[in-house]
Design a protein with these regions (language model features):
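PLP-dependent amino-acid enzyme catalytic core
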Residues: 1-193
């Protein structure tokens, strides 16, 4: 779409043209200095919606196995971080929490994300907690128009959180539909694309 940059600016409040050095170079450091949060702010935002601070468990059998092959006094303690304890059951809730916070802070009525998996459920979960409307634009169908079961299931999770799910086939129409939906609704763009 010819209006891509205009739509992106409207849907995020960021003019990416300010950060372009050349057709192949982008000033990410300048962008982060202008728009980023410090770590204390991130933790505060995530605590508000039950994200992060997930439990850490020792896998004792694995630790024992590693140590049985290691020299005496050596061998790691094997730990696993349980990110399923996040509000949406996914580590992607960490990124989604910041997007939903930013959308609410800037006064957007809703949030949109193009995704085929866990990020959609995370965005829908965080949007619900921030009282924002949510649309998930999802690649569901293969080239034979068969819905991929794991992606269909993620769409159901999004709907359970109150999101509207637009189901598409895999291909370039995903980005077109994202831009069109952003333009039509005026919602915040939480996509990772």
């Amino acid at each position: 779409m010819a209006r891509k940059n205009e739509i992106m600016k409207s849907s995020m409040g960021i003019d990416y043209n300010e950060y372009i050095w050349s057709p192949v170079a982008f000033d990410y450091e300048h962008l982060m200095n202008d728009t980023g949060y410090d770590i204390d702010e991130v933790f505060r935002i995530q605590r508000e919606t039950k994200v992060g601070n997930t439990p850490l468990y020792e896998l004792k059998n694995f630790t024992e196995a590693v140590r049985s092959f290691s020299p005496p006094g050596k061998g790691a303690t094997i730990l696993v971080k349980d990110e399923a304890a996040n509000a949406s059951g996914s580590f992607k809730a960490r990124r989604a929490s910041i997007s939903a916070y930013e959308a609410a802070r800037k006064g957007y009525a809703g949030i949109i994300a193009a995704t085929s998996g866990n990020y959609g459920a995370a965005v829908a979960s965080q949007a619900a907690q921030r009282k924002l409307k949510c649309i998930i634009v999802q690649e569901v169908f293969d080239s034979h128009l068969v819905g991929q079961p794991e992606i269909v299931e993620k769409g159901r999770s999004c709907e359970a959180y109150g999101a509207e799910v637009l189901r598409l086939s895999v291909g370039p129409e995903l980005f077109y539909m994202l831009l069109r939906t952003l333009e039509e609704t005026g919602f915040f763009n939480a996509s990772l694309y």
